[in-house]
Amino acid sequence: MSWFWVFVGFCLLIVLHEAGHFFAAKATGMRVERFFLFFGPTIWSVKRGETEYGVKSIPLGGYVKITGMNPEEDVPPEVAHRSYYRQDVWKRIVVVAAGPAVNIVLAFAILFGVYWANGREEIQQSVGAVRSGTPAAKVLQPGDRIVAVDGNRYAGLSTEERLVKFGETVASHRCDGKQVDGCVAKAPVQLQVRRDGQVKTLTVYPRYDEEAKRALVGFSYGSVNQPVGAGAAAKEAGDAIWEVAKGTAHVFSHLFEAEQREQVSGVVGISDVGHQVIEEGLERALLLLAFVSLSLGLVNLLPILPLDGGHIFWSLVEKVRGRPVSLRVMERATAVGIALVLMLFFLGLSNDIGRITGEGFEVR
């Protein structure tokens, strides 16, 4: 059943994205010929007014067809004044930007609602969960409060900063020789914990985790939710969006670095995560929906054709030059853009396969 809701969420984000383009085009007087979910052969369609609405068979996105999006398109004289390329540059930018804008606004609305309803999550210095089969499973219990790691208490730091230091101390314990997945550190970590009012010193040997790229003990910290007002919830949502935007920009500006290429995920990976998260509860599912919507909006703003950001970029170039960009330049830019989009698609697919099977297309 969770896979069904992953599919529904995916369809919802596509429909809302395309609806942004659709309503903006209508509002600026453009003629919309088609509004379709998915690509490929048509499964179902109906025409209402001048627009055909429908569903196609390949679930890889959706599209809104506006008259005159292609400068070489044959447009009937009676509707030529409503074609895309006959409109002012600002109108074209509004229409193209409306799709990503809807995704970003939706992400903000969901994050705001979740933060306002549930409060701000504050990390605790106590053990929240212990992963089975890990070194921690033999010595730690949920509720144990971590007092010190290797004798280091890191007094004077905030809880978040202290826990980062604890993690760095654990990660400093390395295997003897090459760091491979599952290898055991040559020296143990001394954990001081408070349990039932008593302080105990526990000895545990961390194991290297290939996915995390560091040695881990195998537990997560607990957290509590502190109530917040509407203003604080809005700030939390805005901060989260800003952090994701910075992270997205960093990944795409450093794609030639192996570590950053590994951060790219595709439809398979997102679906797999969605399937797992939905089973964890509504709040986690809503947060995932928000961040996928945000990512969809941000990635579409990349300044490459045929993405929305590419159309915005070349519209701005036209505005600066004072005349349209030649069709030859646009065709070359589109060819390069499609190549980049395909590269990102296969990179994401390779990473997804690697995460699921341990293998990939060896592009990392």
Residue ranges and their predicted role:
Residues 109, 113-117, 297, 301, ...:
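Hydrophobic membrane-targeting alpha-helices
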Residues 2, 6, 87-96, 284-288:
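Residue-level signature of transmembrane alpha-helical entry/exit and packing/kink sites
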Residues 332-352:
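Final/C-terminal transmembrane alpha-helix of multipass membrane proteins
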Residues 74-90, 98, 102-268, 358-364:
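PDZ peptide-recognition modules
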Residues 10-14, 65, 103, 292-300, ...:
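Alpha-helical transmembrane segments of multi-pass membrane proteins
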Residues 44-47, 126-131, 315-332, 361-363:
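Membrane interface segments of multi-pass transport proteins and intramembrane proteases
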